[in-house]
Amino acid sequence: MTKCYVEQDGSRFLLSCDGHAGDVEACNFMTGIVYALAGYVHNAQTEDHAEIFAYETDKARGRFLLHFTGDERTEAAFETAVIGLQMLERERPACIHIDYGEENT
């Protein structure tokens, strides 16, 4: 199972995922979402719309971490990624679990 943690505090965003989903389709779905978000935020940073504080990936451990700040467009990208992960959690609860920081409850 992949355990994700989502936190938003104003214009600061954190998404971390740990562990393997145990299902190839679920893993591919999550990978697409988190890498799309990371790519968007990286591009936003080059255009001075975001700043990445931490970015880590470890395929062997199934680890992803992205901590950043940004404008309303990066916020929309973050929220879209979280919605995608929530959809997967509803459809395949044995593959992913999401915990939320206080600002997200």
At which residue positions do the language-model features occur?
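N-terminal intrinsically disordered, cationic/polar leader segments
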Residues: 1-25, 34-105
